[in-house]
Amino acid sequence: MKKIILISGKAENGKTTLANILKEKLESYGNKVVITRYALYLKEIAKKYCAWDGNKDKDGRELLQKLGTDVIRQKLNKPLFHVGRICEDIEITQDYYDYVIIDDVRYENEVYYPIAMFGKDKVYTVRVTRYNELNGEKVCFTNSLTDEQKKHISETSLDTFSFDYYCTNLTDNFGIIDFDANNIISELDGEA
């Protein structure tokens, strides 16, 4: 494995869009790429035990926030549950791909745990911020979360974190995020 790419950002800001673009571009250079999510097991638990239908509507997001943070991280005091499981998966399978992209990074330990496990040279962090264009000016994108969901720690805990790269996602202009994806790949190549 060459690198783990960790992508963070607010809900609906383009984390998965960037992950898919990076995957496509890296694969075009002959790399094997896997996209996964820290919430992989959380979503399976929500579907199997909580009758979640897989939709990230108001109720679905509320369930995931409560189950993932309020129950697992806080009530059960298992802050490493999500990151630990995915890092174990990566450790087991790391000889089968070049890059793994995790596109739902929400907490500092979801950055520091893989750094401790695999080394700083193997982890690259990206923050995606989405904007709308209004009269030629960039204005912050407003997602569909409720005010309470927007204030949830899973949406705010990395607001002041220092990332390796900051990506702009301009609504209706995928050229910008594509440009940033090329810059990220150039930086990754420069580190190799």
For every predicted segment, state its role.
Residues 9-10:
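P-loop (Walker A) phosphate-binding loop of NTP-binding proteins
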Residues 15:
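Conserved lysine of the Walker
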Residues 18:
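Hydrophobic positions on the alpha1 helix immediately C-terminal to the Walker A/P-loop
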Residues 24-34:
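Post-Walker A helix-loop "phosphate-sensing" segment adjacent to the P-loop in P-loop NTPases
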Residues 37-100:
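ATP-dependent small-molecule kinase phosphotransfer cores
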Residues 86-145:
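ATP-dependent NMP and nucleoside kinases share a basic, alpha-helical "lid"
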Residues 124-192:
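Small-molecule kinase domains that catalyze NTP-dependent phosphoryl transfer to phosphate-bearing small molecules
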